[in-house]
Amino acid sequence: ETSARGIEIGVLVCNAGVLLFGPLAAAPPERIGRIVTLHCTTPALLCRLYGEEMRRRGEGYILVMSSATAWMPYPTIAAYAATKSFLRTFARSLNFEFRKYGVRVTGVFPGAVDTPLYDLDAACRRRLLRWGVMSAPQEVAQHGLRALFRGRSSCIPGVFTKICVCVCRLVPAWLMRCVLRIPAVARLF
């Protein structure tokens, strides 16, 4: 459709998200299908279509919005975390594949972002933003675009999120399971 209209896409931003809370076994199959389609199939098809055009032109930018959950075992959002892990690997693979043709691909891995995705009252949102636990959407977009135009393959906005991702990558699975069994932590999930 865009090619037929003579529209050339120079920057593609794959940024869509829907959260599926609760145990996976209790999730309606059609909801699981929707999250996989939105987070995996749609970006893959868009990147295939517009990435090929960019490759032929020898220039272009693709930003793939993933999530810090791509590195974290996260009970109650297994489908979300798994699809965001797909996007992490997908963005990295595309970066290797397209870089030699002048197309830059950046994966962005924010933590909690202040969007309607989270059902929080205003005071709680302000606190989380002030403490750096949650980021404003504008900040995440700014960090992601800066990384994209600088040719970086990945971007983790926010100090708190960087620390969480680092810890989750270093902590063995058995220790993570123990932490998730602590009553105060378990209540969060």
Kindly give the residue locations of the regions a language model identified.
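Active-site loop immediately N-terminal to the catalytic Tyr-X3-Lys motif
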Residues: 25, 74-78
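Active-site helix of classical SDR
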Residues: 47, 83
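A short helix-coil junction within the Rossmann-fold of NAD(P)-dependent oxidoreductases
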Residues: 5-7, 22-23, 49-58
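SDR active-site lid
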Residues: 96-160
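Conserved NAD(P)H cofactor-binding loop of Rossmann-fold oxidoreductase domains
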Residues: 15-20
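Residue(s) in the substrate-gating loop at a strand-loop-helix junction
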Residues: 67
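Substrate-binding pocket helix/loop in short-chain dehydrogenase/reductase
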Residues: 23-24, 31-35
